[in-house]
Amino acid sequence: MNRSYTACIVLLCCVGIAQESVGQTASPIEPLVLDWEQADWGPPSSERPGFPVGIRNAPIATDPETGGPTYLARFPAGSQFAMHWHTYTETVVVLQGTVSITLDGAEHTATEGNYIIIPGKAHHEWRVPEDADVVLLARRDGPADFFFVEP
C-alpha cells in the first residue's frame, strides 16, 4: 500500500472519529418549551434615566459560551426606550402589539410576528403606542449592555 493512500485512510478515520465525538457531545443548553403568557415576569421597573418605567422582563436563558441572554420584555403602553446602543447584535420578535423603532436613523413600525435585527453598535430607540402594551422576545449575541446616546 503506498504512503499517500495510507495517509488518506488514516486522515479519513480521524475525521470520522472527530465528527462522531462532536455529535455525541451534549449541548450545555437545556430543552425548553415556553408559553410566554405564563412566563416568570419580574416586577415592573422603577424610574431610571433612559429606561421606560414599568417595563417587565422574563429571563429565559443565557448562552453559556457567549453570555448572551434570551428574554421576554413587556413595554407598557405609551412608553419609550431612549436612543441607545449595545455592543452585540440583538435579534427581536414582536409577540404582541405594535412598536415603533428608530434604527440607525430610519423609522420602522413592527407588529406581531415581525423580526428585527439590531446590529451591534446600531443606535436605536423604541416607542410604544398609547393604546396597548408590546411584548418582545429578544436575544443578544453577547452580554447585555446599554449605552445611551445624548440627544
What are these regions (language model features)?
Residues 1-8:
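Bacterial N-terminal signal peptides that target proteins for export
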Residues 10-11, 16, 21:
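Cleavable N-terminal signal peptides
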Residues 22-67, 151:
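A short, N-terminal "cap"/entry segment at the start of jelly-roll beta-barrel domains
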Residues 27, 32-33, 127-151:
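Double-stranded beta-helix
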Residues 66-86, 119-120:
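Conserved short histidine dyad/triad with adjacent acidic residue
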Residues 76-77, 86-104:
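Glycine- and acidic-residue-biased ligand/ion/polar-headgroup-sensing regions
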Residues 104-121:
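Short acidic-glycine-tyrosine-enriched beta hairpin
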